Swiss-Prot record:
The keyword Disulfide bond applies. GO terms for cellular component: extracellular region. Residues 1-21 form the signal peptide. This is Conotoxin Pl171. InterPro entries: Conotoxin_a-typ. Probable neurotoxin with unknown target. Possibly targets ion channels. It is found in: Secreted. GO terms for molecular function: acetylcholine receptor inhibitor activity; ion channel regulator activity; toxin activity. Keywords: Amidation, Disulfide bond, Ion channel impairing toxin, Neurotoxin, Secreted, Signal, Toxin. Coiled coil: none annotated. Belongs to the conotoxin A superfamily. It comes from Conus planorbis.
Amino acid sequence: MGMRMMFTMILLVVLVTTVVSFTLDRVLGPVSDGRNAAPDDEKFDRMEYFLSKCCANPSTCDLSLLCIFG
């Protein structure tokens, strides 16, 4: 693999990581406010709902589903 291809792959991984992180933040909200606060049950209920739908029908498990919760 050439240097350009490796650089492109690294950029792709960074982009995907950023998109997934941003999308999950929209779904769950910030997981912590920096003070080790107790988690908000509503946020985890939404994630549990998403995972149950995703596990029930894996063909619908993509990033576009995450956007409906935002």
